[in-house]
Design a protein with these regions (language model features):
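C-terminal helical "tail/cap" subdomain of flavin- and related membrane-associated enzymes
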Residues: 300-367
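FAD/FMN-dependent oxidoreductases across multiple families
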Residues: 137, 216-301
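A conserved beta-strand/loop capping segment in the N-terminal third of enzymes
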Residues: 50-102
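N-terminal Rossmann-fold NAD(P) dinucleotide-binding loop
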Residues: 14-15
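Glycine-rich FAD pyrophosphate-binding loop
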Residues: 8, 22-42
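Predominantly flavin-linked oxidoreductase catalytic cores and closely associated redox partners
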Residues: 104-238
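Beta1/beta-strand and adjacent pyrophosphate-binding region of the FAD-binding site
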Residues: 1-11
Length: 367
């Protein structure tokens, strides 16, 4: 028997929309390409609005080991500014968060099909059929595309507004003194051509996530080791955080051609959520919130029998402003003059950083 809904992708958006739909009694099948818990190339900042969406799904962030974040430190060359966040926030690994959402979806009755990728997704006689990599097909009345930064054949996103970034992510087991120094902080290191974020997640692990423009990475011979060495030489604080630390894997996770600034505003067929609907620059820390917002909104519109086109248009209205602001700031942040201007302004008006953080959040009246 066909499912009511196919969800392609079991990340934040996919797990959340599956939970919402299954809780409402729909027969949901989730296709997730990884067979078990895994890390993903992204920051792991859970903003206040994201935390509320998770509480609505009965997910206990602190029970999962999430670390409270109250303050941001920004470093550029030999400068540093500090700002308090005006909203409650947490840091939690995607490994833990994604699994919690999939467990919740499963608890409500969603069926999980793990370890297989969707090779294609296509309409068929008023329904949707997903062909998996082992040849099996799944049929459903509706489909949600939630594959994050990875596209499904036939549904490739157009470019964003800033497409030349390469992303890296590596977890580190830091020494106790540096974990204490980092506790309750998220640190942002801006450098010509990119920026890096560092924060604690659960179990005393620090997440180092960064993006760098392709041509800047090429100047370093496309070498992760050279990039990390350069950053540690340029930022004493980062060098201190990683002193004595052990990387949790041999190599960082990596991804290229991130379509920052992309927003889907029309019905292309499947319901697009998460990064398939909007890609906000990583420094904003609001990607998880957008994923959860799109999942809840998509589920509400689907359950109410509203058209996909209405949903995509509403979601675009909700997030376009913040994505546009964040993309503009991202373009400024990767340039030396932009870094100097922002750091200088922040020293004169310390609330500037808090104001920027507010501008890159989903507006309260849209939640």
């Amino acid at each position: 028997m066909p499912a009511d809904v196919l969800v392609i992708g079991g990340g934040v958006a996919g797990g959340a929309v599956a939970a919402h739909l299954a809780r409402a009694g729909r027969h949901v099948v989730v296709i997730e390409r990884k067979s078990g818990p895994h890390d993903k190339v992204c920051g792991e900042f859970v903003s206040g609005e994201a935390a509320q969406y998770l509480r609505d799904l009965d997910i206990d962030l602190e029970g999962l080991g999430a670390v409270r974040i109250t303050t941001v430190r920004i470093y550029a060359r030999h400068q540093m500014v500090t700002a308090s966040l005006r909203f409650p926030a947490f840091s939690l690994s995607r490994r833990a968060l994604d699994e919690a959402l999939l467990r919740t979806a499963s608890k409500y009755g969603a069926q999980l099909r793990r370890g297989h990728s969707a090779r294609s997704l296509r309409p068929l006689g008023g329904q949707w059929v997903a062909e998996l990599d082992h040849g099996r097909n799944f049929l459903a009345g509706g489909s949600f595309l939630a594959t994050g930064k990875h596209d499904v054949r036939g549904w490739r996103r157009p470019p964003g507004k800033q497409n030349d970034f390469i992303g890296f992510k590596l977890h580190w087991r830091v020494v106790a003194a540096q974990a204490a120094a980092l506790s309750s902080y998220v640190e942002l290191f801006v450098f010509p051509g990119g920026y890096a974020g560092l924060s604690l997640v659960e179990n005393g692990i620090a997440n180092l996530c960064l993006v760098i423009r392709r041509h800047s990475f090429e100047r370093l011979d496309n070498s992760w080791e050279a990039l990390l060495t350069t950053l540690r030489a340029d930022f004493l604080a980062l060098h201190q955080r990683l002193s004595g630390a052990e990387p949790c894997s041999d190599r960082p996770l990596a991804i290229a051609s991130i379509p920052y600034g992309y927003v889907q505003s029309r019905n292309i067929g499947p319901w697009c959520i998460g990064d398939q609907a909007a890609v906000i620059p990583s420094f904003s820390g609001d990607g998880i919130a957008i994923a959860l917002h799109s999942a809840r909104l998509g589920a509400e519109y689907y359950l109410a029998g509203k058209a996909n086109s209405e949903f995509q248009a509403r979601l675009a209205r909700d997030v376009t402003g913040q994505v546009r602001v964040a993309t503009l700031l991202s373009r400024v942040l990767v340039k030396r003059w932009g870094q100097d201007a922002i750091m200088g302004a922040a020293r004169v008006a310390p609330r500037l950083i808090s104001d920027i953080a507010d501008l890159t959040r989903i507006p309260n009246d849209r939640l």
